Structure formats: C-alpha cells, structure tokens
Amino acid sequence: MAKQPEDWLNDYPAEEEEEEIIWVSKSEIKRDAEALKKLGTELVELSKSALERVPLDEDLLAAIELAQKIKREGRRRQLQFIGKLLRTRDVEPITIALDKLKNRHNQQITLLHKLEELRDKLIDGNDDVIDEVVALFPQTDRQQLRTLIRNAKKEKAANKPPKSYRQIFQYLKDMAESA
C-alpha cells in the first residue's frame, strides 16, 4: 500500500521545541557595538576611586587601567578591545553604577539649590519657615538659627558683607549632611 502524504510527515522526527530565530540586522549589531565602545570610553575617563564603585571583573579593569595610560592610536585600539570585552559581559550593573555616579553630582546640585531657597525664605520669612526647617532637620538649634537670621537682616539693612547670610547656608548644609 502506498504511503499517504500525511504519513510522510511521520518519517521525519519532529523537534520537540522549535527555537525561534531572531534576525538582527548588521546595522543594529554595529550600533550595539558602538554603544558598548562609548560605555568603555566613559569607564576609561573615570578616576580610580570612581572605578572602584563600578562592578568590573579583573580582565576588564586591567584593560581600562591600561587604556588610561595609553595615548593616541593605541588608546583607540584598546577602547575597541574594551568594547569587545563588554560584549561578552552583562553590562546592566555597570550602566546602573555609572548612572549613580553621574546622578550623585546632580543630586548634590539640587540639594544645594533647595538649601539656598530655604535660606532666602528664612531671611525673608517668619517663624513658620523656622518650624519647617526644624521639621526637615530635627537636630536644628532654633536659637542659633534665629541669631544668624537676625544678624543677616542687620547686615542686609546696613549694606555690610553677607557673612551671616553665608553662615546660614553653611549651617543648613551641615544639618542636611548630618541628617
């Protein structure tokens, strides 16, 4: 008896799990490689103390330290090599650590701006602002803060240099750091 077309399919063993083939364009591969090379360049530009905060293995760390010593064409080749090393590693923890390093500076600037605004409110405001400062920083000495505010107002009225003005900011900065 002749085999039916349905029987021909049974002659070949069916794969239990078919793997999905993901097609990636050559341009996308190049973009990814370039992004990793830029990440490597950022790592090379970091100081030694900042590099210690980034999770790097020994090979990658050695390659980065070598790239920091090399100049010109050798440096370019070393950056290519660092990009190659990064392709074989999980770069997510590295990028997270770099973002934290970059954002730390932005967070400090934001904090300083908030403290400046608070200082200006203290000098222009009333006791409600002092209560707000005490709520933010419980270790604040009200009497010392009031004295600084009073002195700053006197200096401003007499057109003297803003010594107490700066002291209020420094006091608030110290309170923020100790909180």
Curated annotation (Swiss-Prot):
Keyword Nucleus appears in the UniProt entry: no
One GO cellular component, as annotated:
cytosol
Its localization reads:
Cytoplasm
Q: In the UniProt record, does the keyword Isomerase occur?
A: no
Keyword terms of this UniProt record? Cytoplasm, Ribosome biogenesis, RNA-binding, rRNA-binding
Q: Where's it mainly located?
A: cytoplasm
Extract the GO molecular function terms from the UniProt entry: ribosome binding; rRNA binding
Q: Which GO terms describe its biological process?
A: assembly of large subunit precursor of preribosome
Q: Which PANTHER family match?
A: UPF0307 PROTEIN YJGA (PTHR38101:SF1)
Protein name according to UniProt: Dual-action ribosomal maturation protein DarP
Task: Give the lineage.
Answer: Bacteria, Pseudomonadati, Pseudomonadota, Gammaproteobacteria, Enterobacterales
Gene transcribed to yield this protein:
darP
